Amino acid sequence: SLYATAKLGTPWAATQNPGLPLLAYFFQFFGDYADWKIYVGYDILYFSVFAAVVGAVPREKWRVAVPMSAVLWCVPFFFTNYNHTIYLTTTYMTSYGDVPAGLVFGGAVAAWLALRQNSAPKWAVLPILALSANIKANTFVLALVAAGLVAVDEWLFADDGDFKAGLLPRTGFSLACFAAPMAIYYLWNVRYVGWLVSRSASDSGVGETSAPLSAVVVNGIKILLGQPVEGFYAEREAQFRTAMADMGHQFWTSDGKLSMIGQGRNVVALIAIVFAVAILAAASRRLKARIAVIGALSGICFLGYNLMLALSYGFIFVPFQAEQLVDYNRYIYSYYIGWFILALGCLSVALLPQITVKGGADGPTAVFAATRRQPQAAFELFVLVLACGMLFRQGQLILPQLSVLGFADSEFTDRRAERAEAELVCSYLAPDDRVFYVGQGDNGEGWFSAVFDFYPILVDYSGTVTTDPDTGETKMIGGGGELGLPELQPAEGVKNTYYHGFTAQELDDIVRGNGCTVLYIQTLDDIFVQSYADLFTDKLAAAQSGETLLYRVTDAGFAPMPMEVSTQ
């Protein structure tokens, strides 16, 4: 089964949009799962987006294509705030699709511009728009922005310059641009995920956990218009307004270090400059108008995207997420990346010669006159300056010794050890085993790694659904973390933050109730031994002495499984 539809033992895996997991899956060509194969798939996706921007540039225009390629290579790093990370950290790119979502959003529009420039089949953009809707559920709006820009460009600007001629087929194609992403979104996020949510609720799962999107939009707009709201929305109004103010602060002030050039206003200024140069460079009035419309509409959509984020922080996210603007950076740079990519697409087309054909009549003879207009060569220099500037700035922040290139093989020892241990453990398991993960002191990353390292053997979510009797709030507990009796919870630190306080009976019920057949003791500590030793037939003696990592779930308790444990 594919990663996208497999039951990975997590509550969300079956609902994740399958675009990126499928991409990762199809690059696992030979052998077992490996992290680097995911990166290969992502890199090919990135380069396909870059090709969409420079694909229309002919070979003789290498003075444009080469520096433009350098600019594109910088984009995924230039507009993110991870450029100061100096320590190796595991990144599972199947879970963070924000950069790919932004690239595909901009790449779809760039591909459309290249298709029109070369009079290629226009329908080829429809699968790209569909893909853009299948990367992340919360970036579906970016797919709609791309579809809207393509649709407006097609509908307003006829190929022959006659608006009325071919209006009906242009209208049909414009509607198809919206239909492609909306069909994918409806089939997956509405029909399929809706079915899973309803099934979860009927099976005593969490069901629907957030306010309906339509109601969020309506009540949020009412607040902006000064109209009164009631109930839940009145309670969250202050949170909504605070989130908007904080987002504005991040955009305008130096506190918002979201890119290599600082806060959001600097990014928008750079994108505006690229659009302005593209308009000036365009050799025909028609192309100038097309670029101006795309630039203006994408700017309006940027405001709408910010409104969507504010509504999410105000009415969908929990209060602490709104107070801290949790993950704001990766939500907003999806738009920045896509916006910059489509601006570069406009610039690439603007730097190409434009041919206009006018028809007339000389008596009974039809006469067509073709005019070829060349852009000014000086505008090509702008691309070179932009490339040099971005490469210089990136070189300042991402020094070779602070990148993957600067780390010795020994830095990857821990990751290799994790993979080796997973392979060893899996060799003692049956294909239908379900593993309960015990990793004391884990913040969730170890459990998350194990989910993929053990596949196709399932690693359980290792938790349960609980409902607060006072507030009625439903939440998942598990996915790694510190397990122990409620009274043994540490006062501070990682173990306190990720503490799951279960009695021995509760833990036993969770393990058996979730259908787990094996416990994987990745890391032990005194809290776990003191809390749950009586559940194990050997009081955890084998695990403490390093004789085993696995315990089989039996009627008599959790029994140690004999295995050869590496001493390394």
Residue ranges and their predicted role:
Residues S1-L23, D32-Y33:
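Extracytoplasmic catalytic/substrate-binding loops of multi-pass membrane glycan-assembly enzymes
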Residues F26-F29, L167-L280:
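Membrane-lumen/periplasm interface segments of specific transmembrane helices
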Residues V40-A65:
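Transmembrane-helix motifs of polytopic, lipid-linked glycan transferases
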Residues T94-F105, I135, V141-L142, P319-V349:
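Hydrophobic/aromatic-rich transmembrane helices and adjacent perimembrane loops
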Residues K122-A137, V141-G148:
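Membrane-interface alpha helices of multi-pass inner-membrane proteins
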Residues L142-F178, D460-T464:
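Perimembrane helix-loop-helix junctions
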Residues L196, S200, G207, L381-F448, ...:
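Membrane-embedded, lumen/periplasm-facing catalytic core of multi-pass transferases
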Residues E423-G480, I521-D525:
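Short periplasmic/luminal acceptor-recognition loop of GT-C membrane glycosyltransferases, typified by
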